[in-house]
């Protein structure tokens, strides 16, 4: 398969004996500390969780113990991952399914005993 015209391939590499093209990839830098949440979102505006991060970060820089910032940490993580929201939706879905199964079982039981013979 010849893909030498592909914009991400090089025709000559230091490994010229290898038949496969070399693919470039983008590596996103990972910063530690303040740079980790710079405030810039993917659209160029402020990120959706930046305010939560700033509140949590400020609390951590002024608190005596990390447990003092537990609620702010939970808010920040919920903004990032939506885990509590997904758990709630899952509980609602399971309850709806349970009610549907119970209604169908009740309908089957009622249908078994009522045969009309004319």
UniProtKB/Swiss-Prot annotation:
Record keywords, A-Z: Disulfide bond, Electron transport, Membrane, Mitochondrion, Mitochondrion inner membrane, Respiratory chain, Transport
Compartments where found: Mitochondrion; Mitochondrion inner membrane; Mitochondrion intermembrane space
InterPro entries per the UniProt record, alphabetical: NADH_UbQ_OxRdtase_FeS-su5 (IPR019342)
GO cellular component, one term: mitochondrial inner membrane
Motif Cx9C motif 2, chain ranges: 69-79
Region spans: Disordered: 98-118
Motif Cx9C motif 1 boundaries: 49-59
Signal peptide start-end: none
Domain CHCH: 46-87
One Pfam family recorded for the sequence: Ndufs5
Topology in the lipid bilayer: Peripheral membrane protein
Lineage: superkingdom: Eukaryota
Disulfide pattern: 49-79, 59-69
Single Gene Ontology BP annotation: photorespiration
Role according to the record: Accessory subunit of the mitochondrial membrane respiratory chain NADH dehydrogenase (Complex I), that is believed not to be involved in catalysis. Complex I functions in the transfer of electrons from NADH to the respiratory chain. The immediate electron acceptor for the enzyme is believed to be ubiquinone.
Alphabetized PANTHER family for the sequence: NADH DEHYDROGENASE [UBIQUINONE] IRON-SULFUR PROTEIN 5, NADH DEHYDROGENASE [UBIQUINONE] IRON-SULFUR PROTEIN 5-A-RELATED
Free-text note on domains in this protein's UniProt record: Contains two C-X9-C motifs that are predicted to form a helix-coil-helix structure, permitting the formation of intramolecular disulfide bonds.
Subunit-structure text: Complex I is composed of at least 49 different subunits. This is a component of the iron-sulfur (IP) fragment of the enzyme.
Similarity annotation: Belongs to the complex I NDUFS5 subunit family.
Protein name: NADH dehydrogenase [ubiquinone] iron-sulfur protein 5-A
Source organism: Arabidopsis thaliana (Mouse-ear cress)
